[in-house]
């Protein structure tokens, strides 16, 4: 069994009052729809025309990671789990000029969007990550459903009833019902030759072994393909975001970092891609997610201006430490928060959001563009093991949810998986996903382009 990494110590936290939860959730409600009169919404007893039952009791005064089992209700043709819901009344009760919501959708949305479960859970895997198996998404089977968006849709329905006005979802460009963020973590540029060469040697195919070595010495590596990756996304009118890993030495725990060094030649190639409209961001190495000095040193290596984007190598993230490190370093956006083990919604939300700072009781200033699907998730002995023809059919229901709510589909496809030799989660599967996104009218945007459409926290 691989070693399990312990969570960091639980730091002091600010009280999480009903007002705190309401403010955080209504802020994101106002970002998901245009011109939302959030002042109309309050908890029962405050005389607001739209009231939400306060069903969380003293849950948020404690540090338990998991609430009681959710109550499942039908909403918008979908079975949706509602936490903090006793289920004794209809979900939404409408009378002239008023609306009552019997489930505490504010507390439920706050619980999921803030990442409460992983902040207060001690569960971590060998990479220091909160494991999918420990999540409520896994326990109740809703990882591919953006549950928080359904909660906000309940609020939307109530507001429309009270005001008589239709709330329009956020738009991403002329005629674009949702957005797509296409990204590539640059872990390996020099190692395509290793697996076939080792296989030839083990099998005793000495001629093949010699040919593999000769090709390695005389030809560019098949994974040294940044320009080809950029061209592949450009076919769909998209720009890629390349997350660059600045450390080539393994982490202290032996986990590999990059197989390349940041040479002047590589920087020239990246600069040329940036001039073509592609984006360069930081892929912070092993050991940076819990060390500000290490992280900020790498930020300065890769990002030549204040701000910029980040995704941590191996999706490492310690919820009690990492958000504060990102915030202190002045990063503009992050795109780490997805489960390595399963595609879907780690925070049950298909829009970007401002992570919650438990120490201050308010939102951080940096922006999270959650990760929905990673190529390695789809075909890996440790994760899912989808067949070559099963990838797109498995993803379409999740992608359709993002389209339904006008969210952002974040795709991570490593450059090494553009190698034609990869038939499991390789270029064919990537092009199938891109074709679906383009066919549904997605606006392809870089991380900075997405961030620029949102106000600061």
Region spans (language model):
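Terminal accessory/targeting
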Residues: 1-260, 351, 358-457
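Catalytic domains of cell-wall/extracellular-matrix polysaccharide-remodeling enzymes
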Residues: 22, 26, 286-365, 411, ...
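Metal-dependent polysaccharide deacetylase catalytic core of the NodB/CE4 family, i.e.
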Residues: 188-192, 224-321, 343, 415
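Short, surface-exposed, charge-dense and proline/glycine-enriched linear segments
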Residues: 199-202, 270-280, 310-318, 334-346, ...
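Electropositive, surface-exposed helix/loop patches at the edges of structured domains
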Residues: 277-289, 294-297, 301-302, 312-330, ...
């Amino acid at each position: 069994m691989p070693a399990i990494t312990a969570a960091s110590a639980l730091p002091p936290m600010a009280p999480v009052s009903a007002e705190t939860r309401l403010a955080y959730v209504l802020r994101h409600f106002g970002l998901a729809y245009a011109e939302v009169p959030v002042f109309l919404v309050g908890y029962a007893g405050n005389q607001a025309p739209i009231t939400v039952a306060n069903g969380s009791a003293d849950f948020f005064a404690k540090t338990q990671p998991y609430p009681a089992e959710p109550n499942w209700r039908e909403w918008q043709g979908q079975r949706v789990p509602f936490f903090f819901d006793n289920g004794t009344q209809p979900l939404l009760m409408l009378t002239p000029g008023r609306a009552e919501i019997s489930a505490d959708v504010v507390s439920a949305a706050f619980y999921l969007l803030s990442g409460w479960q992983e902040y207060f859970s001690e569960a971590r895997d060998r990479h220091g990550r909160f494991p999918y198996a420990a999540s409520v998404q896994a326990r109740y089977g809703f990882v591919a459903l953006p549950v928080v968006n359904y909660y906000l849709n309940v609020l939307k329905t109530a507001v429309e009833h009270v005001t008589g006005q239709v709330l329009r979802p956020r738009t991403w460009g002329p005629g674009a019902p949702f957005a797509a963020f296409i990204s590539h973590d640059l872990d390996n540029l020099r190692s395509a030759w290793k697996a076939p060469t080792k296989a030839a040697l083990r099998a005793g195919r000495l001629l093949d072994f010699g040919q593999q070595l000769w090709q390695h010495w005389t030809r560019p590596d098949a994974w040294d393909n940044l320009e080809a990756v950029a061209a592949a996304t450009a076919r769909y009118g998209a720009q890629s975001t390349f997350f660059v890993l600045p450390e080539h030495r393994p982490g202290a725990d032996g986990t590999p970092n990059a197989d390349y060094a940041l040479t002047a030649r590589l920087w020239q190639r990246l600069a040329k891609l940036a001039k073509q409209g592609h984006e360069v961001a930081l892929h912070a190495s092993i050991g940076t997610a819990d060390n500000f000095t290490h992280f900020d040193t790498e930020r300065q290596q890769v990002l030549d201006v204040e701000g910029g984007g980040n995704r941590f190598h191996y999706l490492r993230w310690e919820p009690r430490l990492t958000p504060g490190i990102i915030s202190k370093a002045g990063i503009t956006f992050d795109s780490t928060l997805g489960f390595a083990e399963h595609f879907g919604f780690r925070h049950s939300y298909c829009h970007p959001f401002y992570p919650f700072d438990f120490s201050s009781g308010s939102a951080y200033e940096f922006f999270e563009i959650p990760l929905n699907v990673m190529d390695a998730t789809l075909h890996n002995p440790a994760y899912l093991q989808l067949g070559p023809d099963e990838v797109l059919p498995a993803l379409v229901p999740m992608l359709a949810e993002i389209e339904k709510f006008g969210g952002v589909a974040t795709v991570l496809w490593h450059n090494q998986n553009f190698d034609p030799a990869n038939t499991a989660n390789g270029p064919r599967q990537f092009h199938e996903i891109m074709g679906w996104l383009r066919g549904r009218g997605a606006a392809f945007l870089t991380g900075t382009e997405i961030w620029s459409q949102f106000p600061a926290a």
